Amino acid sequence: TLLPTVALPDPADGPLDPAAIMPGAKQVWLEIGFGGGEHLAGQAARHPDTLMIGCEPFLNGVGSALRHIEEGGLKNVRIHADDARAVLAALPDASVDHVLILFPDPWPKARHAKRRLVQADVVSEMARILKVDGKLRFVTDWKAYADWALARFLETPGLVWMAEAADDWRNAPADHIRTRYEDKRLGDTEPVFLLFERRAAPAA
């Protein structure tokens, strides 16, 4: 099986060192909840010098991603087949260039909102691991989750929304890779693209 060769070191064993995981990597990207892995593998193929870390707790998605990795002969992907929070906690400060969250489980009912990935403490960890000028990308097709997530991101020190016009949320980034999930249109709105940048703390 391919999984042992592409498995991320277990974050329970201690801090993760991206430079040791892929020596010489020019960038580090983290995709949280990669689903079937089309986006993860597609970006890895485009950026062979980038360490692509993917987190996905569902084994069907992991199996699909492994097929994409094998078919593409990709050497720059590492997978954590479990909850992403442990990976966030184990990554060093300012060690990641890109955090990507594409179509996470929406938990659309208000009483389930606390089950969503995007919570204040988790977003603070994302901000901590991002390098200055690093990017965070969040995409959902559920309006309530888009509103919820935008509020969580905006209240997080160090994250700045990159929107320049009122309808920027409609526009996919130039490097966006569509997935089967996106094409199914399961949500209640068109895809909402929220892009943020990590800024340095102001000098005291």
Could you describe each region identified by the protein language model?
Residues 89-98:
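A short acidic, Gly/Pro-enriched loop at the edge of an enzyme's catalytic core
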Residues 145, 151-204:
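Class I S-adenosyl-L-methionine
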Residues 1-30, 38-47:
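S-adenosyl-L-methionine
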Residues 27-86:
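SAM cofactor-binding core of SAM-dependent methyltransferases
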Residues 99, 126-127, 136, 149:
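Class I S-adenosylmethionine-dependent transferase superfamily signal
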Residues 118-132:
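A short glycine-rich, Lys/Arg-flanked "PGG" loop and its adjoining helix->strand segment in the class I
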Residues 132-140:
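Conserved beta-strand signature within the Rossmann-like core of class I S-adenosyl-L-methionine
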Residues 97-116:
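A short SAM/SAH-binding and catalytic strip from SAM-dependent methyltransferases
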